[in-house]
């Protein structure tokens, strides 16, 4: 699959435990974004984008509303952001973003996930420079030239448009997120985005094959089992 697919997360959690973690992560992130930038989505574009993504991932409305109400009340928990970088199985590059009320606990849990799965935790900036923060949209389609023309006519800055397996991926600077979405939805009102997100896109991919594949899957699962982990980005290209 293309780069966008390599970094997208499952849009629906499959088990009750995964759903609980998904709801908790969205609730925490919505609370932090609303507390920092305001509780009205029209005036807080980061909150608006986050709510749209939560709805697409089928997060219940009451989870979203409770997080916003909590932010309205002031006080509450204070969360710090924490980012960890390093190399995973097969020497792939990994970025782990966290929201935590206890940095020491989070570091310990993330480090254990690295240590137990043939991965190496690096220092800040170890691999971050090899990823670009980008707006990524993925939707059904075959005609990449038509999509590129739509975006050019709307004066949208685009990094890449690619087609693979009947899906079009649009990658643009993260600052162009709403311009891309508006241009596409205006031109194609019935468009259905499978992915619409701001994420870290790797500049190069690292093949992961053989025995490293199972270790890599275990490594990612261990990271995502950490309650404070919000997102995991990597450049692994799994070789079947």
Swiss-Prot record:
Gene Ontology biological process terms in this record: regulation of DNA-templated transcription
Pfam families: TACO1_YebC_N, Transcrip_reg
Top-level taxon: Bacteria
InterPro entries according to UniProt: Integrase-like_N (IPR017856), TACO1_YebC-like_2nd/3rd_dom (IPR048300), TACO1_YebC_N (IPR049083), Transcrip_reg_TACO1-like (IPR002876), Transcrip_reg_TACO1-like_dom3 (IPR026564), YebC-like (IPR029072)
Any GO molecular function: DNA binding
GO cellular component annotations of the record: cytosol
Keyword DNA repair (UniProt): no
Annotated localization: Cytoplasm
Alphabetized UniProt keyword annotations: Cytoplasm, DNA-binding, Transcription, Transcription regulation
NCBIfam families: PRK12378.1
Family stated for the protein in its record: Belongs to the TACO1 family.
Record's protein name: Probable transcriptional regulatory protein SO_3401
UniProt organism field: Shewanella oneidensis (strain ATCC 700550 / JCM 31522 / CIP 106686 / LMG 19005 / NCIMB 14063 / MR-1)
């Amino acid at each position: 699959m293309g780069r966008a697919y390599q970094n997208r997360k499952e849009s629906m959690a499959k088990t009750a435990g995964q759903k609980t973690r998904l709801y908790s992560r969205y609730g925490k992130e919505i609370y932090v974004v609303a507390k920092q930038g305001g509780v009205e989505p029209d005036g807080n574009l980061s909150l608006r984008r986050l709510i749209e993504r939560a709805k697409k991932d089928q997060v219940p409305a009451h989870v979203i509303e409770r997080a916003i109400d909590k932010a309205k009340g002031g006080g509450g928990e204070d969360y710090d952001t924490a980012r960890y970088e390093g190399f995973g199985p097969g020497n792939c590059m990994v970025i782990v973003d966290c929201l935590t009320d206890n940095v020491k606990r989070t570091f310990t849990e993330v480090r254990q996930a690295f240590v137990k799965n043939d991965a190496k935790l690096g220092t800040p900036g170890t691999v971050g420079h090899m990823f670009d923060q980008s707006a990524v949209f993925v939707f059904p389609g075959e005609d990449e030239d038509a999509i590129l023309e739509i975006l050019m006519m709307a004066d949208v800055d685009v990094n890449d448009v690619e087609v693979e397996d009947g899906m079009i991926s649009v990658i643009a600077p993260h600052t162009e997120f709403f311009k891309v979405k508006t241009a596409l939805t205006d031109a194609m009102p019935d468009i259905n985005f499978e992915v619409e997100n701001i994420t870290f896109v790797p500049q190069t991919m690292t093949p992961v094959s053989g025995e490293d594949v199972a270790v890599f899957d275990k490594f990612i699962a261990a990271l995502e089992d950490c309650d404070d982990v919000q997102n995991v980005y990597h450049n692994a290209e799994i070789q079947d």
